C-alpha cells in the first residue's frame, strides 16, 4: 500500500522530493519512476542500485525503509540496526525492531553485540526476549 501511494505521488508531479531546497530535475523524476517500477516487479537489488545513482539521501532512505519493511529481504541485523539508529524519526520503528530481532544469528553476531543491543533497546518480540 505504501509503495502504491508513493508511486502515485511520483507519477503525478514534476517536482518530487526536495533535498536542500533543490527540486528533482525531470531526469531524476524519470529515474525515480524507474526505481518504483523495479520495486513493483520485486527487483529490489536493482531498485537499490538505481537509488544510489540518484544520490539523494531522502529518496535513498525512503527506498531503503520500504525494503527493510518487507519481511523477506537480504538485509541483516546490522542493516536494520544502522538504519534505525540513523533514522530515528521514520515510521514503523517497532516493526523494524521486530524484524531486526528475527535477523539475529548467534553464529554471526557476538554475544557481546547482542547483549549491547538489548541493553539499549527493549525487545519487542518473544523471539527478541529469548535472545
Which role does the model predict for each range below?
Residues 1-19:
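Classical Sec-dependent N-terminal signal peptides that target proteins to the secretory pathway
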Residues 18-131:
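Alpha-helical solenoid repeat scaffolds
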Amino acid at each position: 500500500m505504501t509503495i502504491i501511494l508513493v508511486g502515485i505521488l511520483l507519477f503525478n508531479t514534476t517536482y518530487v522530493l526536495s533535498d536542500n531546497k533543490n527540486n528533482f530535475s525531470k531526469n531524476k523524476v524519470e529515474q525515480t519512476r524507474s526505481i518504483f517500477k523495479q520495486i513493483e516487479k520485486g527487483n529490489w537489488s536493482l531498485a537499490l542500485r538505481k537509488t544510489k545513482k540518484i544520490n539523494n539521501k531522502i529518496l535513498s532512505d525512503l527506498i531503503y525503509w520500504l525494503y527493510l519493511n518487507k519481511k523477506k529481504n537480504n538485509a541483516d541485523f546490522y542493516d536494520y540496526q544502522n538504519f534505525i539508529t540513523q533514522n530515528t524519526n521514520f515510521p514503523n520503528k517497532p516493526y523494524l525492531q521486530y524484524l531486526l530481532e528475527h535477523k539475529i544469528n548467534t553464529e554471526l553476531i557476538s554475544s557481546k553485540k547482542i547483549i549491547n543491543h538489548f541493553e539499549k533497546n527493549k525487545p519487542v518480540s518473544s523471539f527478541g526476549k529469548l535472545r
